[in-house]
Amino acid sequence: MRVPQHYKKPGWQRFFAGMMCGAVISWFFFLFTYGTFQEEQVSLIEKQKEHVKDLNNQISIYQEDLHKLNEDNKRKLLIQSVSVKLLNGDKYKISQPDKTKFEEHVKDDISEVITKDIESVYQTKDLLKRTIENKVYMINEKKYEATVRELIIYTRLTVELEISFAT
């Protein structure tokens, strides 16, 4: 048996040439459509990567803000400074430098409350009052006792005092 020679017949030659041209054209069509779809996918992935990057930046910004707010809240919940005010110094004719010296002396006595949290200072406010009131202060070689009139506990501890002669 012999296989017929198709390459000599022009009908078969056109058929095979058409198949080859069709295969080449369909291959180019496949490459074009595949490339188009891949280009769309790549652009979609790039958009998603950019969106994820933006979201990560937002997350980091929010985390930084949250961290700063937490630090501020921690700082706000601590006693940061002490303020002492003498209310009736004029009644005893105490000069301004002596008033300032007295206020500084009281500040030194209660300065350990700085950097303590407000809640613990509030719980020990009676002890703080007694610490101030039980001490005898010397101003111009005269002995004075202090009475706490007002004690404000916040980020700044404010103490308003009245003095009287010690007995």
From Swiss-Prot:
Query: Main subcellular localization, coarse class?
Result: membrane
Compartment list: Cell membrane
What membrane topology does the UniProt entry give? Single-pass membrane protein
Parts forming coiled coils = none
The transmembrane residues are 15-35
**Sorted alphabetically, which keywords does the UniProt record give?**
Cell membrane, Membrane, Transmembrane, Transmembrane helix
Upregulation details from the record are: Expression requires the sigma-E factor SigE.
- The answer to whether UniProt assigns keyword Membrane to this entry is yes
Any single Gene Ontology cellular-component annotation: plasma membrane
* Function (record text): Involved in sporulation.
The protein depicted here goes by the name Sporulation membrane protein YtrI
Report the gene name.
Answer: ytrI
